[in-house]
C-alpha cells in the first residue's frame, strides 16, 4: 500500500480540497482517507465543540464517516469517492495516543491519504505534499518542523503579487522541490494528480 500525507501551514488554505481532489482524480487507489484534528484547551474531542471537560475519556475520539452529505470534511472525502473516511480528534500534543488505532486502520486500507502535518512524527509516508499560501501569515509549528520533508509544494495562487512574510521560516528548505500552483475552487490540477500517480506507481514497483 501507499500512504500520502497532505499538510499545510495554516487553516483554510485548501488542504481538504487537495485531499478530496486527489481522491476524485485517482479513484483506482481505493483510498482510505483520514482527517486528523488536534484541539486546544476548551474544546471537546468528541465533537469539536467548546466544552469544559477535562476527563481522560475526552482526550481522544476516532469515528468513521458514514454520510456523504453531512457537510463535514470527512463527508467530502466520501463524496469524492473514498472507500472509507475516518476522523481522528485528539488534544494538542496527544496524537501518540491515537496511533494504535490509526495503524490498525492503515492495516485495513488498500491505500491511505491523510490530512495532517503532525502525523509525520509517527510515520514516514510514501509522499508528503505541503500546501502554502503567501496570503496567510500564520505558520504552524508542525508545518515548519516538517517543511524539509515535503516531496512537493502546492502553492495557492496569489493575488496582486503577494510575497510571503513568514517569521522564522526558511524557504531554502523547499528549494529545488517540485512546485505546483493550485487555485480555488478545487485546488487540484492534472499535473498534481499525475505527480502523485507516478510517485505511487514507482513506490509499488519498488515494493514488489
Range-by-range predicted roles:
Residues 104-111, 116-198:
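Conserved catalytic-core segment of NTP-binding enzymes
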Residues 21-90:
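N-terminal phosphate/diphosphate-binding loop that engages ATP/GTP or pyrophosphate donors
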Residues 196-208:
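Short, hydrophobic alpha-helical segments
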Amino acid at each position: 500500500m501507499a500512504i500520502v500525507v497532505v499538510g499545510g501551514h495554516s487553516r483554510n488554505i485548501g488542504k481538504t480540497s487537495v485531499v478530496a481532489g486527489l481522491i476524485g482524480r485517482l479513484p483506482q487507489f481505493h483510498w482510505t482517507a483520514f482527517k486528523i484534528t488536534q484541539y486546544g484547551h476548551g474544546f471537546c474531542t468528541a465533537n469539536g465543540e467548546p466544552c469544559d471537560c477535562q476527563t481522560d475519556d475526552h482526550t481522544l475520539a476516532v469515528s468513521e464517516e458514514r454520510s456523504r452529505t453531512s457537510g463535514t470534511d470527512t463527508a467530502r472525502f466520501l463524496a469524492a469517492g473514498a472507500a472509507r473516511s475516518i476522523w481522528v480528534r485528539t488534544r494538542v500534543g496527544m496524537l501518540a495516543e491515537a496511533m494504535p488505532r490509526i495503524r490498525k486502520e492503515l492495516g485495513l486500507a488498500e491505500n491511505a491519504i491523510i490530512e495532517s502535518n503532525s502525523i509525520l512524527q509517527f510515520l514516514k509516508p510514501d509522499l508528503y505534499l505541503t500546501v502554502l499560501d503567501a496570503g496567510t501569515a500564520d505558520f504552524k509549528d508542525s508545518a515548519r518542523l516538517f517543511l524539509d520533508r515535503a516531496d512537493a509544494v502546492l502553492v495557492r495562487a496569489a493575488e496582486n503579487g503577494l510575497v510571503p512574510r513568514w517569521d522564522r521560516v526558511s524557504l531554502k528548505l523547499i528549494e529545488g522541490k517540485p512546485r505546483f500552483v493550485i487555485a480555488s475552487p478545487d485546488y487540484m490540477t492534472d499535473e498534481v494528480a499525475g505527480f502523485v500517480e507516478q510517485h505511487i506507481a514507482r513506490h509499488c514497483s519498488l515494493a514488489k
